[in-house]
Curated annotation (Swiss-Prot):
GO terms for molecular function: oxidoreductase activity. It is found in: Cytoplasm. Belongs to the P33MONOX family. This is Putative monooxygenase p33MONOX. It comes from the Eukaryota. Signal peptide: none annotated. A motif (Flavin-containing monooxygenase motif) lies at residues 50-60. InterPro entries: P33MONOX (IPR026759). Keywords: Cytoplasm, NADP, Oxidoreductase. GO terms for cellular component: cytoplasm. Residues 139-179, 245-287 are annotated as: Disordered.
Length: 287
């Protein structure tokens, strides 16, 4: 390996330096960044002109100018190549994606048979323009099915005589489909008449869901979107458990807890002996 210019090779024995108490010799004074920068280390067979200049023992300025211009000319080519390959790869990936989407469309039956392309577009371009349309169709189909399911379930859970008492599930939006159709004339008059209501309540025919006061929390507001089988509140659950326990304390056996219960319970006789440490295994995870 050839040493860079400005760094002379010096025979240095570390064993002798260990035995010798004198300090190690400092590097030469001419070893600095300027020397290495003026004559850079260039691999062999890279630039033939530089090799000729070095062999011909030319002046110091020539090596400085030549590598910069040559490196610029060399560096330009790979950058352009990389950009070109990047663009080509992007277009290829886009084309493959579009083709796979079209294949899926054909399999799912989302494509219209009688589609006529725009006059200014070729048939090849219209294939790519129709991808967003097909995705929109797919979303619409899935949205309609969920809407129908929710309507049937709400109609089953709340049997009613009038069609408007069962709340319909609609997407949020200002002018959503069927929002104006669901408002009857007396409802609209009642909304207008109630002047002391909130503006969101008064103009609730723009949005599908009206804000009403909740029954459990008198201070807060809840969105009443579904009035089917409502979940019982925790207070109601506790009351139901207490009534069940007072009715038949023998059948109701809650897991053993540290909280003392005032009601007396009969200790059912077990054939097997359970130590108190084993009750941790037997208690359900909800407690």
């Amino acid at each position: 390996m050839s040493l860079p210019l400005g760094v002379p090779r010096r025979a240095f024995s570390y064993d002798d330096a260990l035995e010798d108490t004198a300090p190690m010799t400092p590097p030469p004074a001419d070893l600095c960044a300027n020397v290495l920068w003026k004559q850079p280390v260039i691999p062999e067979r890279k630039y033939q002109e530089l090799a000729k200049i070095e062999e011909g023992d030319a002046n110091m300025n020539a090596p400085v100018i030549t590598p910069s211009s040559s490196t610029e000319s060399v560096n330009k080519v790979p950058v352009v190549k990389a950009k070109a390959t990047h663009i080509i790869m992007n277009s290829l990936i886009t084309k493959q994606t579009q083709e796979s989407i079209q294949r899926f469309e054909q399999q799912a039956g989302l494509r219209d048979a009688g589609y006529t392309p725009h006059k200014g577009l070729t048939a090849e371009e219209t294939k790519y323009h129709r991808v967003a349309e097909a995705v929109h169709k797919l979303k619409m189909q899935s949205g309609e099915t969920t809407k129908d399911d929710k309507q049937t379930s709400s109609a089953q859970s709340t049997p009613s005589s009038t069609p408007h008492s069962s709340p319909k599930h609609k997407n949020r939006g200002w002018f959503s489909q069927g929002s104006s159709a669901s408002i009857t004339a007396p409802d609209f008059v009642a909304m207008e008449a109630g002047g002391d209501r909130l503006p969101s309540e008064r103009w609730s025919f723009f949005g599908p869901k009206a804000i009403q006061k909740s029954t459990n929390d008198p201070g807060g507001f809840t969105i009443q979107s579904y009035k089917g089988a409502q979940k019982p509140s925790p207070m109601e659950l506790m009351r139901a458990q207490a009534t069940r326990m007072t009715e038949d304390p023998v059948t109701f056996k809650p897991p053993k807890m540290d909280i003392p219960v005032t009601e007396g319970r009969k200790q059912s006789s077990h054939s097997h002996n359970i130590k108190p440490r084993d009750l941790n295994v037997l208690t359900p995870t909800g407690f």
